């Protein structure tokens, strides 16, 4: 008599593997979301640092040329390279990754998840405020 061997996985084994994959995915997805948020915050911090540097360089140039410390109205105008997504002054944030300078006092950014943040900017003192969701 010939023995027939069935090779492969049983239905129970396949279900157990699917459950384990589901558990791993449930743990990994929230951590991945936190990583994306952290990356966007780091990118925003980099842009703000570049803006602060551009504002200070402008102020130092003003001291040298005019003997008075003045700050630019729009800090984006004096950056070496504007950030990707900068759409100009007083534009509507309607695209992911977009930056704008609003009403002469706010720097605004829309993240890829459509959340929006802004920082105050005082052109009299060159000071930037903290990140605020809006």
Q: Could you say what each language-model-derived stretch is?
A:
Residues 60-117:
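Extracellular/periplasmic head regions of type IV pilus-like filament subunits
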Residues 29, 34-37, 56, 60, ...:
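Short helix-capping and hinge/turn segments at secondary-structure transitions, especially at repeat
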Residues 116-134:
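Low-complexity, S/T/G/P-rich flexible repeat/linker segments used as non-globular hinges
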Residues 3-35:
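N-terminal single-pass transmembrane signal-anchor helix
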Residues 39-65:
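Membrane-proximal N-terminal amphipathic helix
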Residues 34-39, 70-72:
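Conserved interaction-surface patches within small, structured recognition/assembly domains
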């Amino acid at each position: 008599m010939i023995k027939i061997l069935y090779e492969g996985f049983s239905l129970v084994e396949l279900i157990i593997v699917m459950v384990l994959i589901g558990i791993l995915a449930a743990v990994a997805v929230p951590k991945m979301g936190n990583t994306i948020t952290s990356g966007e915050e780091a990118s925003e911090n980099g842009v703000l640092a570049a803006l602060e540097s551009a504002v200070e360089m402008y102020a130092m140039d003003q001291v040298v040329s005019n003997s008075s410390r003045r700050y630019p109205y729009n800090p984006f105008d004096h950056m070496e390279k504007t950030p990707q997504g900068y759409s100009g002054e007083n534009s509507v944030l309607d695209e992911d990754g977009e930056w704008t300078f609003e009403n002469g006092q706010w720097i605004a950014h829309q993240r890829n998840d459509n959340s929006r943040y802004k920082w105050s900017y005082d052109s009299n003192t060159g000071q930037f405020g903290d990140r605020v969701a809006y």
